[in-house]
């Protein structure tokens, strides 16, 4: 099963540098903290609609090429992050199988728990970069994060109902 928003997310084109945008947009696109937390600060009840969670081969995560170690399998999680039941963000997390050892195994068992609830409570979380992307109409971003030094790639597409717009 897929979702049209995930097709748009995969179509994002990334800027080589941070573009000159309105401060309001940059505030959302360059947020270092949890997007889940930001949505909750808007007074919303945040929930996850799980689209897909599975091991996939490298051909299904081509956007990770050069950004993550080359491995035969990756854990892929695709979700919609909803605020009061309305989708505000599409998310796609790609985790190399080698990252899923030790406490990071929990990434395979998040289910309907927002990723941010786990990531941003970890004292071992670091972020290598944020890249801003855009398709024809929507903004997005991707980040390489590390848990205990082990990488994962998070891509987020802000949907039309999101307060980013």
Swiss-Prot record:
Subcellular localization(s) per the UniProt record: Cytoplasm
Keywords on record: Cytoplasm, Lyase, Pyruvate, Ubiquinone biosynthesis
Gene Ontology terms for molecular function: chorismate lyase activity
Keyword Cytoplasm: yes
Predominant cellular place of this UniProt entry's protein: cytoplasm
Binding site for substrate: 35, 77, 115, 156
Pfam families named in the record: Chor_lyase
EC code: 4.1.3.40
Pathway: Cofactor biosynthesis; ubiquinone biosynthesis
InterPro entries: Chorismate--pyruvate_lyase, Chorismate_lyase_/UTRA_dom_sf
Signal sequence bounds: none
Listed SUPFAM superfamilies: Chorismate lyase-like
GO cellular component: cytosol
Catalytic activity: chorismate = 4-hydroxybenzoate + pyruvate
Enzyme category, top tier: lyase
Keyword Cytoplasm: yes
Assigned protein family: Belongs to the UbiC family.
NCBIfam families on file: PRK11655.1
Function as written in the Swiss-Prot or TrEMBL entry: Removes the pyruvyl group from chorismate, with concomitant aromatization of the ring, to provide 4-hydroxybenzoate (4HB) for the ubiquinone pathway.
Subunit-structure text: Monomer.
Protein name: Chorismate pyruvate-lyase
Organism of provenance: Salmonella gallinarum (strain 287/91 / NCTC 13346)
Gene name of this polypeptide: ubiC
